[in-house]
Amino acid sequence: MFRARGFSETGMRDIADAAGLSPANLYHYFRGKDEILFYCQDRALDRMLAGISSARRLNGPVPARLHQVLSSHLQVMLDEVEGATAHLQTDALPPALRDRIVRKRDRYEHGLRALVAAGVARGECVAPDPALAARAMLGALNWTVTWFNPAGPRSASEIGEAVAAFLVRGVAARSTNIKPTRLTLVRRKSRTTGARHV
């Protein structure tokens, strides 16, 4: 509902109807739509942080681990339940909930920055400013939700693999041997049209 109508235009009754619940049942779990938005963002960030932790425990080349993190990030962002534009609407949350999300988001950004810095230290990445590189990656990944079409010809997984490959090649050292990701972009029948969506 947040994807289709936007947070401000979506009411609890709309969400209940879409979920096949009565408003009373929905209110049993959430006191308002801001709690639903918080749940979506908090759960998404937990998945992203788990991806960072997993990648940092591995011993393989940093570009390969970075690819794993970025691809996973985008699949979370494009998830029908936890992702979409809901992840970008932090300002819609009450201050107490927003602060919790911002702290967790900052932890994730710091983890991504540390991974890029590790690649630089090992000579596998070229990024004079790892913080800037990490933020540029996050900007590209997060903006994808504004043009991705779930009914389009490419799945979230395919988009995630392709975008991650582009971004990793932007920081990978020329001497680093990165095995290209083979993508089989299966064309699916689109229920909508529009050149700006994929």
What feature does the model see in each segment?
Residues 43-49, 79, 96-121, 131-135:
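Amphipathic alpha-helical packing segments from all-alpha helical-bundle domains
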Residues 39, 53-79, 133-137, 181, ...:
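Hydrophobic alpha-helical connector segments
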Residues 49, 67, 71, 109-117, ...:
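An amphipathic alpha-helix signature
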Residues 1-35, 39:
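Helix-turn-helix
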Residues 12, 34, 38, 42, ...:
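Short, structured helix-loop boundary elements
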Residues 30, 88-93:
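Short helix-capping/turn signature of helix-turn-helix
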Residues 4-8, 59, 80, 122:
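Short coil/turn segments at alpha/beta junctions that flank glycine-rich nucleotide-binding fingerprints
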Residues 84-89, 98-102, 120-166, 174-188, ...:
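Hydrophobic/aromatic-rich alpha-helical bundle segments in the mid-to-C-terminal region
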